[in-house]
Amino acid sequence: MSNSIVIQTSSTVIEDMKQQYKQALSPKIPQGGIFMAKVPSCTITAYKSGKVMFQGGRAEAEASRWQTVSQTPKSTVKKSVNSHQYAPPSSIGTMSILGSDEVGTGDYFGPMTVVAVYVDAKQIPLLKELGVKDSKNLNDAQIAEIAKQLLHVVPYSSLVLHNEKYNELFDKGNNQGKLKALLHNKAITNLLAKIAPTKPEGILIDQFTQPDTYYKYLAKQKQVQRENVYFATKGESVHLAVAAASILARYSFVKQFDELSKKAGMQLPKGAGKQVDIAAAKLIQKVGKERLPEFVKVHFANTEKAFRLLKK
Protein backbone atom coordinates (compact mmCIF):
# COMPACT_ATOMS: atom_id res chain seq x y z
CA MET A 1 0.00 0.00 0.00
CA SER A 2 1.46 3.36 -1.00
CA ASN A 3 1.78 6.28 1.41
CA SER A 4 0.14 9.65 0.92
CA ILE A 5 1.33 12.82 2.68
CA VAL A 6 -0.03 16.36 2.30
CA ILE A 7 1.79 19.52 3.38
CA GLN A 8 0.61 23.14 3.29
CA THR A 9 3.14 25.62 1.95
CA SER A 10 3.59 29.01 0.29
CA SER A 11 3.47 29.91 -3.40
CA THR A 12 7.19 30.80 -3.20
CA VAL A 13 8.11 27.30 -2.01
CA ILE A 14 5.84 25.71 -4.64
CA GLU A 15 7.70 27.68 -7.33
CA ASP A 16 10.99 26.49 -5.82
CA MET A 17 9.68 22.91 -5.85
CA LYS A 18 8.60 23.22 -9.49
CA GLN A 19 12.13 24.39 -10.34
CA GLN A 20 13.72 21.51 -8.39
CA TYR A 21 11.47 18.91 -10.06
CA LYS A 22 11.66 20.44 -13.56
CA GLN A 23 13.32 17.31 -14.99
CA ALA A 24 10.44 15.17 -13.71
CA LEU A 25 7.39 17.32 -14.57
CA SER A 26 4.36 15.50 -15.98
CA PRO A 27 2.29 17.04 -18.81
CA LYS A 28 -0.83 16.02 -16.86
CA ILE A 29 -1.96 18.63 -14.31
CA PRO A 30 -5.10 17.93 -12.25
CA GLN A 31 -7.87 20.52 -11.87
CA GLY A 32 -6.73 23.23 -9.47
CA GLY A 33 -3.15 22.02 -9.80
CA ILE A 34 0.06 23.96 -10.49
CA PHE A 35 2.25 21.00 -11.44
CA MET A 36 2.64 17.25 -11.15
CA ALA A 37 6.05 15.59 -11.03
CA LYS A 38 7.03 11.92 -11.00
CA VAL A 39 10.30 10.86 -9.38
CA PRO A 40 11.31 7.29 -8.49
CA SER A 41 8.66 5.81 -6.13
CA CYS A 42 6.87 9.13 -5.59
CA THR A 43 4.37 11.41 -7.36
CA ILE A 44 4.26 15.05 -6.25
CA THR A 45 1.18 17.19 -6.98
CA ALA A 46 1.05 20.89 -6.04
CA TYR A 47 -2.25 22.78 -5.89
CA LYS A 48 -3.19 26.46 -6.11
CA SER A 49 -4.55 26.17 -2.55
CA GLY A 50 -0.96 25.76 -1.31
CA LYS A 51 -1.37 22.04 -0.60
CA VAL A 52 1.24 19.63 -1.94
CA MET A 53 0.52 15.90 -2.03
CA PHE A 54 3.25 13.24 -2.03
CA GLN A 55 2.16 9.70 -3.02
CA GLY A 56 4.16 6.49 -3.24
CA GLY A 57 6.73 4.42 -1.41
CA ARG A 58 9.07 7.40 -0.94
CA ALA A 59 6.33 9.92 -0.06
CA GLU A 60 7.58 10.48 3.49
CA ALA A 61 11.23 10.91 2.46
CA GLU A 62 10.32 13.29 -0.37
CA ALA A 63 7.93 15.36 1.78
CA SER A 64 10.51 15.66 4.58
CA ARG A 65 12.78 17.60 2.20
CA TRP A 66 10.23 20.37 2.09
CA GLN A 67 8.64 20.36 5.52
CA THR A 68 10.98 22.86 7.22
CA VAL A 69 10.70 25.18 4.24
CA SER A 70 6.91 24.69 4.11
CA GLN A 71 6.57 26.37 7.50
CA THR A 72 7.27 29.71 5.79
CA PRO A 73 4.15 31.91 6.29
CA LYS A 74 2.17 32.55 3.14
CA SER A 75 2.64 36.03 1.72
CA THR A 76 -0.54 38.02 1.20
CA VAL A 77 1.13 40.22 -1.42
CA LYS A 78 2.25 38.66 -4.69
CA LYS A 79 5.82 39.77 -5.36
CA SER A 80 8.08 39.38 -8.34
CA VAL A 81 11.09 37.10 -7.91
CA ASN A 82 13.44 40.12 -7.59
CA SER A 83 11.15 42.12 -5.28
CA HIS A 84 12.75 41.75 -1.84
CA GLN A 85 14.87 43.61 0.71
CA TYR A 86 18.05 42.05 -0.70
CA ALA A 87 17.81 43.71 -4.13
CA PRO A 88 21.18 45.25 -5.15
CA PRO A 89 21.60 49.04 -5.40
CA SER A 90 21.46 50.56 -8.89
CA SER A 91 25.15 51.54 -8.61
CA ILE A 92 26.35 47.97 -7.91
CA GLY A 93 27.89 47.52 -11.38
CA THR A 94 30.72 49.93 -10.50
CA MET A 95 31.36 48.63 -6.95
CA SER A 96 33.96 46.19 -5.54
CA ILE A 97 31.87 43.04 -5.29
CA LEU A 98 32.19 39.39 -4.27
CA GLY A 99 29.92 37.37 -6.57
CA SER A 100 28.91 33.70 -6.62
CA ASP A 101 27.30 31.38 -9.16
CA GLU A 102 26.74 27.66 -9.70
CA VAL A 103 26.84 25.25 -12.65
CA GLY A 104 25.72 21.66 -13.16
CA THR A 105 22.38 21.71 -11.36
CA GLY A 106 20.40 20.85 -14.50
CA ASP A 107 22.83 18.20 -15.77
CA TYR A 108 22.07 14.54 -15.02
CA PHE A 109 25.71 13.51 -15.38
CA GLY A 110 28.45 15.38 -13.56
CA PRO A 111 28.87 17.30 -10.32
CA MET A 112 27.55 20.61 -9.05
CA THR A 113 30.18 23.36 -8.97
CA VAL A 114 29.96 26.67 -7.13
CA VAL A 115 32.51 29.48 -7.40
CA ALA A 116 32.81 32.81 -5.59
CA VAL A 117 34.96 35.58 -7.11
CA TYR A 118 36.05 38.96 -5.74
CA VAL A 119 36.35 41.76 -8.29
CA ASP A 120 37.80 45.09 -7.18
CA ALA A 121 36.16 48.05 -8.94
CA LYS A 122 39.54 48.90 -10.51
CA GLN A 123 39.60 45.46 -12.21
CA ILE A 124 36.27 45.89 -14.04
CA PRO A 125 37.85 47.35 -17.25
CA LEU A 126 40.38 44.48 -17.32
CA LEU A 127 37.63 41.85 -16.99
CA LYS A 128 35.73 43.49 -19.84
CA GLU A 129 38.93 43.39 -21.90
CA LEU A 130 39.29 39.65 -21.15
CA GLY A 131 35.79 39.08 -22.54
CA VAL A 132 34.09 38.23 -19.25
CA LYS A 133 30.34 37.83 -19.72
CA ASP A 134 27.64 35.27 -18.96
CA SER A 135 29.12 31.78 -19.48
CA LYS A 136 25.89 30.65 -21.20
CA ASN A 137 26.88 32.88 -24.14
CA LEU A 138 30.33 31.27 -24.44
CA ASN A 139 31.36 27.87 -25.78
CA ASP A 140 33.65 25.50 -23.83
CA ALA A 141 36.78 26.63 -25.73
CA GLN A 142 36.07 30.31 -24.98
CA ILE A 143 35.33 29.44 -21.35
CA ALA A 144 38.70 27.69 -21.01
CA GLU A 145 40.60 30.56 -22.62
CA ILE A 146 39.05 33.25 -20.39
CA ALA A 147 39.11 31.08 -17.24
CA LYS A 148 42.85 30.38 -17.52
CA GLN A 149 43.49 34.13 -17.46
CA LEU A 150 40.95 34.82 -14.71
CA LEU A 151 42.64 32.30 -12.39
CA HIS A 152 45.67 34.62 -12.26
CA VAL A 153 43.70 37.87 -12.04
CA VAL A 154 40.96 37.49 -9.41
CA PRO A 155 40.81 35.87 -5.95
CA TYR A 156 38.31 32.99 -5.99
CA SER A 157 36.96 29.99 -4.07
CA SER A 158 35.88 26.94 -6.06
CA LEU A 159 33.82 24.05 -4.66
CA VAL A 160 32.83 20.79 -6.35
CA LEU A 161 30.07 18.54 -5.03
CA HIS A 162 30.77 15.18 -6.66
CA ASN A 163 27.90 12.88 -7.59
CA GLU A 164 28.36 10.29 -4.84
CA LYS A 165 28.34 12.95 -2.12
CA TYR A 166 25.49 14.82 -3.85
CA ASN A 167 23.32 11.67 -3.84
CA GLU A 168 24.24 10.86 -0.25
CA LEU A 169 23.22 14.36 0.92
CA PHE A 170 20.06 14.30 -1.21
CA ASP A 171 19.03 10.97 0.33
CA LYS A 172 19.45 12.52 3.77
CA GLY A 173 16.68 15.00 2.98
CA ASN A 174 18.58 17.89 1.40
CA ASN A 175 16.86 19.18 -1.73
CA GLN A 176 18.89 20.76 -4.51
CA GLY A 177 18.02 24.29 -3.35
CA LYS A 178 19.51 23.58 0.08
CA LEU A 179 22.66 22.04 -1.41
CA LYS A 180 23.14 25.14 -3.56
CA ALA A 181 22.66 27.42 -0.55
CA LEU A 182 25.21 25.46 1.51
CA LEU A 183 27.79 25.60 -1.29
CA HIS A 184 27.28 29.31 -2.04
CA ASN A 185 27.62 30.19 1.64
CA LYS A 186 30.75 28.03 2.01
CA ALA A 187 32.43 29.47 -1.11
CA ILE A 188 31.65 33.04 0.02
CA THR A 189 32.93 32.36 3.56
CA ASN A 190 36.13 30.77 2.19
CA LEU A 191 36.80 33.72 -0.11
CA LEU A 192 36.14 36.36 2.56
CA ALA A 193 38.80 34.65 4.70
CA LYS A 194 41.16 34.52 1.71
CA ILE A 195 40.92 38.26 0.88
CA ALA A 196 40.88 39.52 4.50
CA PRO A 197 41.41 42.23 5.68
CA THR A 198 39.95 43.49 2.38
CA LYS A 199 36.18 43.72 2.60
CA PRO A 200 33.93 43.82 -0.46
CA GLU A 201 31.39 46.62 -0.75
CA GLY A 202 28.79 43.94 -1.24
CA ILE A 203 28.17 40.24 -1.89
CA LEU A 204 26.01 39.36 -4.91
CA ILE A 205 24.50 35.89 -5.19
CA ASP A 206 23.03 34.75 -8.49
CA GLN A 207 19.51 34.17 -7.17
CA PHE A 208 18.15 30.62 -7.43
CA THR A 209 15.48 30.92 -4.70
CA GLN A 210 13.91 33.64 -2.57
CA PRO A 211 16.43 35.11 -0.06
CA ASP A 212 14.26 34.15 2.94
CA THR A 213 14.26 30.54 1.74
CA TYR A 214 18.03 30.70 1.17
CA TYR A 215 18.57 31.73 4.80
CA LYS A 216 16.16 29.05 6.06
CA TYR A 217 18.31 26.47 4.28
CA LEU A 218 21.32 27.80 6.25
CA ALA A 219 19.55 27.88 9.64
CA LYS A 220 21.84 25.24 11.21
CA GLN A 221 25.12 26.61 9.83
CA LYS A 222 27.59 28.24 12.22
CA GLN A 223 28.90 30.79 9.71
CA VAL A 224 26.32 32.53 7.56
CA GLN A 225 27.11 35.66 5.56
CA ARG A 226 24.40 38.32 5.97
CA GLU A 227 26.22 41.65 5.82
CA ASN A 228 25.72 43.60 2.55
CA VAL A 229 24.40 40.48 0.80
CA TYR A 230 22.35 41.01 -2.36
CA PHE A 231 20.40 38.58 -4.54
CA ALA A 232 19.51 39.05 -8.21
CA THR A 233 18.39 36.74 -10.99
CA LYS A 234 20.70 36.93 -14.03
CA GLY A 235 23.36 38.22 -11.64
CA GLU A 236 26.03 37.95 -14.36
CA SER A 237 24.43 40.97 -16.07
CA VAL A 238 24.29 42.89 -12.76
CA HIS A 239 28.02 42.64 -11.92
CA LEU A 240 31.07 41.11 -13.62
CA ALA A 241 31.99 39.30 -10.36
CA VAL A 242 29.04 36.93 -10.93
CA ALA A 243 29.91 36.62 -14.64
CA ALA A 244 33.50 35.70 -13.67
CA ALA A 245 32.20 33.21 -11.07
CA SER A 246 29.94 31.70 -13.74
CA ILE A 247 32.90 31.25 -16.12
CA LEU A 248 35.14 29.64 -13.49
CA ALA A 249 32.30 27.39 -12.30
CA ARG A 250 31.67 26.28 -15.88
CA TYR A 251 35.40 25.71 -16.47
CA SER A 252 35.61 23.55 -13.35
CA PHE A 253 32.45 21.66 -14.33
CA VAL A 254 33.72 20.90 -17.86
CA LYS A 255 37.06 19.60 -16.48
CA GLN A 256 35.26 17.38 -13.95
CA PHE A 257 32.84 16.22 -16.66
CA ASP A 258 35.71 15.19 -18.95
CA GLU A 259 37.28 13.19 -16.11
CA LEU A 260 33.93 11.49 -15.48
CA SER A 261 33.66 10.54 -19.17
CA LYS A 262 37.13 8.97 -18.97
CA LYS A 263 36.08 7.07 -15.85
CA ALA A 264 32.92 5.87 -17.62
CA GLY A 265 34.91 4.82 -20.69
CA MET A 266 32.43 6.67 -22.90
CA GLN A 267 31.56 10.26 -23.81
CA LEU A 268 28.82 11.39 -21.45
CA PRO A 269 26.34 13.99 -22.77
CA LYS A 270 25.45 17.17 -20.89
CA GLY A 271 21.92 18.26 -20.00
CA ALA A 272 18.99 15.98 -19.21
CA GLY A 273 17.36 15.19 -22.57
CA LYS A 274 16.67 11.95 -24.47
CA GLN A 275 20.32 11.45 -25.45
CA VAL A 276 21.10 11.43 -21.72
CA ASP A 277 18.55 8.64 -21.10
CA ILE A 278 20.22 6.54 -23.83
CA ALA A 279 23.72 7.21 -22.45
CA ALA A 280 22.56 6.34 -18.91
CA ALA A 281 21.12 3.02 -20.13
CA LYS A 282 24.45 2.23 -21.85
CA LEU A 283 26.37 3.17 -18.71
CA ILE A 284 24.21 0.89 -16.54
CA GLN A 285 24.94 -1.99 -18.94
CA LYS A 286 28.65 -1.11 -18.87
CA VAL A 287 29.34 -0.57 -15.14
CA GLY A 288 26.23 -1.94 -13.39
CA LYS A 289 23.42 -0.09 -11.62
CA GLU A 290 25.32 -0.16 -8.30
CA ARG A 291 27.90 2.30 -9.68
CA LEU A 292 25.37 4.70 -11.22
CA PRO A 293 25.50 7.13 -8.22
CA GLU A 294 29.19 7.78 -9.02
CA PHE A 295 28.17 9.43 -12.30
CA VAL A 296 24.65 10.86 -12.02
CA LYS A 297 22.14 12.78 -9.92
CA VAL A 298 19.99 9.75 -9.14
CA HIS A 299 16.76 11.64 -8.29
CA PHE A 300 16.46 13.03 -11.85
CA ALA A 301 13.70 11.42 -13.96
CA ASN A 302 16.44 10.22 -16.36
CA THR A 303 17.21 7.32 -13.98
CA GLU A 304 13.74 5.85 -14.34
CA LYS A 305 13.75 6.49 -18.11
CA ALA A 306 17.12 4.72 -18.50
CA PHE A 307 15.85 1.62 -16.69
CA ARG A 308 12.71 1.65 -18.87
CA LEU A 309 14.92 1.68 -21.99
CA LEU A 310 16.79 -1.36 -20.69
CA LYS A 311 13.52 -3.30 -20.34
CA LYS A 312 12.61 -2.79 -24.02
UniProtKB/Swiss-Prot annotation:
Q: Which SUPFAM superfamilies match?
A: Ribonuclease H-like
Q: Write the record's keywords in alphabetical order, separated by commas.
A: Cytoplasm, Endonuclease, Hydrolase, Magnesium, Metal-binding, Nuclease
Q: Does the keyword Chloroplast apply?
A: no
GO biological-process terms attached to the record: DNA replication, removal of RNA primer; mismatch repair
Residues engaged in binding a divalent metal cation: D101, E102, D206
Q: What is its EC number?
A: 3.1.26.4
Broad EC category: hydrolase
What the record says about family reads: Belongs to the RNase HII family. RnhC subfamily.
Q: What does this protein do?
A: Endonuclease that specifically degrades the RNA of RNA-DNA hybrids.
- What is the name listed in the Swiss-Prot or TrEMBL entry for this protein? Ribonuclease HIII
Organism from which the protein derives: Bacillus mycoides (strain KBAB4) (Bacillus weihenstephanensis)
